[in-house]
């Protein structure tokens, strides 16, 4: 939710060093849209709409919080390395990234979907070594290894549905919500690899050093999640 209230703290500067405050990393799209009501419960409202701006750093109505807008896959990296104090990322992204150096504190129970395999409708399972197109290279390898299948994984960054249609891959691995995009391209979901929801993660050093700032926000967000 956008808010036209100004942040009049004279020490508030969204650019540059922000040691006196908290930096929150979010990604555009569904996660941002579904996270904003939870942040509102903690008194954090954006002063501008990221969907209508080219800016990447945004002030909020909370005097000690600014928000970074990133690619979803970059959120764990920013939090892990201390460029952001906390963030919201999908469980799929966290598992793929291998974010061992952050605390995963809360399942926000938003942006729910499934990581699944998918292929052309009615196709026979190919013999021999499979070709799998995906942006989830690590999770894909782990999944097929658990089945005892050898696969060649082809890294893509988008439009996964195209791969089986043009012979680039036998199957894809991607997140599935309604399945409408798959069906529109003659594909069908097959096997579920994992259920996915968005998680609140915190930099380990920030969790200790900025605990007095973080604790009230985390408690209010958790309460908002529990009341949904």
Swiss-Prot record:
A Gene Ontology term for the protein's cellular component: cytoplasm
Keyword tags: Amino-acid biosynthesis, ATP-binding, Cytoplasm, Glycosyltransferase, Histidine biosynthesis, Nucleotide-binding, Transferase
Transferase in keyword set: yes
One Pfam family of this chain: HisG
InterPro entries, A to Z: ATP_PRibTrfase_cat, ATP_PRibTrfase_CS, ATP_PRibTrfase_HisG, ATP_PRibTrfase_HisG_short
Cross-referenced CDD domains: PBP2_HisGs
Molecular function terms from GO: ATP binding; ATP phosphoribosyltransferase activity
Pathway(s): Amino-acid biosynthesis; L-histidine biosynthesis; L-histidine from 5-phospho-alpha-D-ribose 1-diphosphate: step 1/9
SUPFAM superfamilies, per database record: Periplasmic binding protein-like II (SSF53850)
GO biological process: L-histidine biosynthetic process
Location in or out of the cell: Cytoplasm
Chief localisation class: cytoplasm
Gene3D superfamilies given in the database record: Periplasmic binding protein-like II (3.40.190.10)
Enzyme Commission number(s) from the entry: 2.4.2.17
Catalytic activity of the protein: 1-(5-phospho-beta-D-ribosyl)-ATP + diphosphate = 5-phospho-alpha-D-ribose 1-diphosphate + ATP
Superkingdom to which the source organism belongs: Bacteria
Subunit record text: Heteromultimer composed of HisG and HisZ subunits.
Function, as annotated: Catalyzes the condensation of ATP and 5-phosphoribose 1-diphosphate to form N'-(5'-phosphoribosyl)-ATP (PR-ATP). Has a crucial role in the pathway because the rate of histidine biosynthesis seems to be controlled primarily by regulation of HisG enzymatic activity.
HAMAP family linked: HisG_Short
Record comment regarding domains: Lacks the C-terminal regulatory region which is replaced by HisZ.
Family from the record: Belongs to the ATP phosphoribosyltransferase family. Short subfamily.
Protein name (record): ATP phosphoribosyltransferase
Source species taxonomy: Bacteria, Pseudomonadati, Pseudomonadota, Gammaproteobacteria, Moraxellales
């Amino acid at each position: 939710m956008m808010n036209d209230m100004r942040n009049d703290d004279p020490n508030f500067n969204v650019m540059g060093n922000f040691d006196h405050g908290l930096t929150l990393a979010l990604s555009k799209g569904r996660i941002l849209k579904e996270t904003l009501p939870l942040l509102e419960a903690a008194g954090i409202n954006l002063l501008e709409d990221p969907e209508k701006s080219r800016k990447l750093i945004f002030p909020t109505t909370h005097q000690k919080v600014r928000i970074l807008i990133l690619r979803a896959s970059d959120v764990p990296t920013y939090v892990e390395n201390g460029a952001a104090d906390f963030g919201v990322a999908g469980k799929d992204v966290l598992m793929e990234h291998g974010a061992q150096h952050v605390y995963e504190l809360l399942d926000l129970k938003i942006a729910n979907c499934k990581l699944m395999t998918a292929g052309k409708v009615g196709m026979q399972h190919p013999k021999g070594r499979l070709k799998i197109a995906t942006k989830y290279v690590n999770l894909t390898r782990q999944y097929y290894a658990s089945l005892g299948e050898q696969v060649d994984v082809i890294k893509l960054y988008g439009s996964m549905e195209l791969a089986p249609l043009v012979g680039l891959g036998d199957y894809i691995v991607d997140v599935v919500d309604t399945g409408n995009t798959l069906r529109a391209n003659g594909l069908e979901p097959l096997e579920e690899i994992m259920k996915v929801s968005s998680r609140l993660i915190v930099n380990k050093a920030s969790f200790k050093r900025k605990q007095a700032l973080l604790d009230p926000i985390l408690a209010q967000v958790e309460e908002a999640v529990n009341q949904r």
